[in-house]
Structures are given as C-alpha cells and as structure tokens.
Amino acid sequence: MNKYDFGGKQMKKILLAASEAVPVVKTGGLADVTGALPKYFDKEKYDVRVMLPKYMCMKDEWKEKLQYHTHFYMDLNWRKQYVGVLEMEYDGIKFYFIDNEYYFNGYAPYGDMYADIEKFAFFSKAVLSALPLIDFRPDIIHCHDWQTGLVPIYLDNFRYGNEFYRGIKTVMTIHNLKFQGTWDPKRVRDITGLPQYYFAPDKLEAYKDANYLKGGIVYADRVTTVSNSYAEEIKTPFYGEKLDGLMNARANCLSGIVNGIDYEDYNPLTDNKIERNYDVSNFRKEKIKNKIALQKELGLEENHKTMMIGIVSRLTDQKGFDLIAYVMDELCQDAVQIVALGTGEEQYENMFRHFAWKYPGKVSANIYYSEAMSHKIYASCDAFLMPSLFEPCGLSQLMSLRYGTVPIVRETGGLKDTVEPYNEYEKTGTGFSFMNYNAHEMLATVRYAEQIYYDKKRDWNKIVERAMNKDFSWKNSAKQYEELYEGM
C-alpha cells in the first residue's frame, strides 16, 4: 500500500500559504495558526505543507536550516524577477520559503503599504509558479489574510493556459477583516499584470480601490474566519468593514472555525516559565504560590488572598482600553491588584504608568512584551480582563482558561464562542461576560466576579475547574478544517 493510498482514496494534499508562521516569523495570532495547525492533521490522510516568504529579518538559526531546492525567473507584468525556493522540515512538516532579496529585505515582515502591495503580489504569484517545480500539486491551497488574497485570482487566471492548475481549490481565511490590502487600481494593475477584467466592482475593486482581501473572498471556493460569532458579525455594517454586503453574498460558503492554542507550549503542569507547576487537581494550593512569586517580582503588596487581575494585550482601542481608562480609578478602589503587560497606543501605555505610580502596591505596568512574563501572568492571576470592541477569535482567553485564570470578557466574536458566562443558579460557566460596549457595564461585571471570588470561594474554584477542563487544543480546530476540506 503506497503512502497516497488508504482504502482506495488518495491522500489529500494541502498547501497553507501565509506571510508568517511560528516558530520562524511572528507578528501576531496569524503565525500561531499557520505554524501550529499543520501538525494536528491526520498524517494518514493529509499531506500538509506550508509556504512562506524568506525574510531577511528571520533569525539566523532558521536561515541556517534552509536547503536550496530550485530557482527560476518570473514575470510580474513588465518586471522579470528572481524566485528562489528553499525548504526545511520542522515537526514533521515541510516548509517552503520563497526567496527574493529585493522584496523581503526589510527589518520587519511588513513595511509601508506601498511596498507591501507589490511584495505580496509577487509572493502570491510566486507561490503558484513554484508548484510545478517542487513537484507538489495541492488539491487545496489554504490562503490566510490579505497578503495571500491574490492567490485565488492568479489561480483563476493561470487555469486558462495551464492544465496543471485546473481543479485546484482554494480556501480564504480571514483573521481580521480590518486589514484588507488596498491601493490604487492603476498601480495594482501595473504591479500584478492581471487583465482589466479583474478590476471590476464585483471582483477586485471596492470603493474605487483595488482590494486584495476582497479579491480573495470573491474567488476562493470557501471562506472561513476564526470564530462562528465573528462569521455572523462581519455580515453587519458595524463589524463588516465595508465588506458586509460581500460577506452576505458569500454566506453559503462562509464558516467560522475557532483557533486553538498549542497545549504543549501552554501547559501549567510542565511549563518551565512559571514558579510552580499545577493541574486541575491541585491548583487551589499551587496557583497561590505563583501569585506570591509574581507579587514579589513586581513589587506588589504580598497577599495571597487579594484578587489579582491580569491583562496581556496590545494596548489599543480595539482591545477595549478606552473602557478600562474610563473606570480605572474606580477599579483601583476595590480590593484587587492589576497586572498589565503589552505595548501599543501611547495614551494607554501612559495610563497604566500613571496608575502604577498612583497605586504602587496595586498596579503593575509592564510596558513591553515578554513570552515568559505572559506565562507568569496566566499562571498567577485569578482573573483575566479582555473587554474587546471586536475580537475575531482571541487567543489570550484560551490561554487563561488553560491556566485556570477566569476570563472576564465582552460578548463579541471568539470571546462569545469560547467563554461561557457564569450562572450562579445552575452552577455553570467558565468566566464572566458583559454585552454592551460600556465602561460601567464592564466594571459591574468585574465587581460581580470579585463578589464570587471573595464571598463564594467554592463556586469560584468550580469555575476554575470547568475552565481548566475545557479543550481548546489545535486538535479540535484541525478536525473542523478536515471536515471543510472533505466537503470541497
């Protein structure tokens, strides 16, 4: 029985095309999906590979692992560009890298939009052009965000002249509809060399701009986003970022699949970044020891009974920090400690610095990002605050559930799908939530959580238990993607 034959069926070949993936290059949650998801597919049935740009800013340890596969020259309209293809194997998954120093030479994966528009047009075309030369013909190309939005369009264009590309299907996953990759159509036509046919309001064009994400959504066979609620929300004007009409038109092909987290990296029982390891059987004793260690490290008042609220986030409006700023003074009157970690808009960075100065024993402002500190916060805090304006999926609440840190969230997108609100009568729920984007509604919910924490400790511990027993590993997400692929 050969490796492509199980029960008379062929092995399905999947290519994930994206602009970033862990552990090689990461700027956000997209990298977690494209890097972690592939290894959770059924290896008997799926041959899953990943294709990325080879950025100059990648760490040397990864560059040294890359092996040369082939190179060729590709037309990008009137330009003739070098395309190198390198490869490596990591965690049993084959990664390909598209090399071109002119496009990928910056100090960061993304630069200014003008450069990125050409860079990712090149990448999208190179992904397809490389396939015949690496002897891999995928059944499905799974594209992620606007950076690969042109892949389904180029594929449509390639089909006419080349048998190789006929029958290849595409999936377009939207991680955040806010970022669409838009530029002047004349310039985009000059860059891409695509026929005028594609530059129409029912195709690539949106509001007089060429829009990469829109093009991908129009031409992909299936469109997914990263939670069921977000898939519904983006059909409305408030969340739809001017594409709600298109999302409604594609509703039959649109579905939401929640991201997972890597249960090996995020495991309170084996995590070497935290003071004391624990699991659902002994968190009552061991979690407190993490809290005291963190209080000591951050110079907060040492008291294991004080409710500690954690925040790990980009400090931006989207994440609800205008709500926090509005009631922070009131919140600091309560018997709580607040530990914040992250960088972002200056006004919010300074807001946390101000309150850390005003309430030195109660508030700790860590205006930087550190993986190790984030693990300590998940392991030490009692609650985790995430009052987002919108949240396509959100990973922080999944990490806090895993560590038994009770999430307090606004009911939107992935937060609504993954955090079940506490019900004191039925004794159910894994967190606390509020509905309206309102600072005092948020404050009332935090205070309700405080009340349960201080006055009904047994109920609180049961919430923690239920949270820790939830399964948001990548296994679940991979199963749903497998079902999606099978239905195509």
Regions found by a protein language model. Give the residues of each.
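Catalytic cores of nucleotide-sugar-dependent glycosyltransferases that transfer UDP/GDP/TDP-activated
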Residues: 2-488
